[in-house]
Amino acid sequence: NDFVITPNSTWHEHGVEEGGKTCIWQDGLDIPLVNALEANDYAVLEGKQELIAPLNYSPIAYGCAGLIPADKTWDKPYSPLFKYSWKNVYPALLEAQKVNEINPFDGIFMQYSNPLTGGHVMQTMGAAMQLLPAGFKGKAHKHTGSFVYQCAKGRGYTIINGKRFDWKERDIFCVPSWAWHEHHNLSETEDACLFNFNDLPVIEGLGLYQGRELTDNNGHQQIQ
């Protein structure tokens, strides 16, 4: 459930420690947008990258207690924090639940952010994690911006444009832009968590974000 960013034009490689277990992850790419803009840039590095910082430098330097290095400069347009650990994210959601009202559409919805700006982690893609309390029955709304979800914890279902999609941990589903949707947690005793990545940085940057709440049927869709 860790979230790792590999921003545009950054060298990156994936691997598993010797003797480690097989690793499967979900990739989120902005290639369709970048290709449409004819701005794609792709290159292959011969060999492996040379390590220039200590292990876990980024999450240790930029992901601790709201503190950032006072003697470092960062001039990149993306977050200097490359790894957002689930072991920190889930407790943060639980703490946020103690002091925030439950949103009727999204429960507790927290955006992954650039610690230097408070904005999105990258210029073309955003990400968020939301907690649906036990027994949560979300109301329906729709908005511009496309969202791809992965269930990080629990089980439930989402109704998208009148069709029900059940999900459990590791399942992936998407909500297209301007589609009615509502999330439901099937457990009456355990919370559920949904991760998403989205194109909100682009939508918001172009001034195209808008949303609407469903008012019929007490805010819930009729399942087709």
Residues of each region from the PLM?
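Short, conserved beta-strand element in jelly-roll/cupin
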Residues: T124, M129-A134, H141-I160, F197-N198
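Short amphipathic alpha-helical linker/capping segments at the junctions of internal repeats
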Residues: N1-F3, L33, L45-E50, R164-F173, ...
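Active-site lining segments that contact anionic ligands and/or coordinate catalytic metals
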Residues: G107, T124-A127, G145-S146, R155, ...
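A short, N-terminal "cap"/entry segment at the start of jelly-roll beta-barrel domains
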Residues: V44, K48-T124, A128, Q210, ...
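Conserved metal-binding segment of the jelly-roll/cupin
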Residues: N1-E18, W25, I160, W167-S187, ...
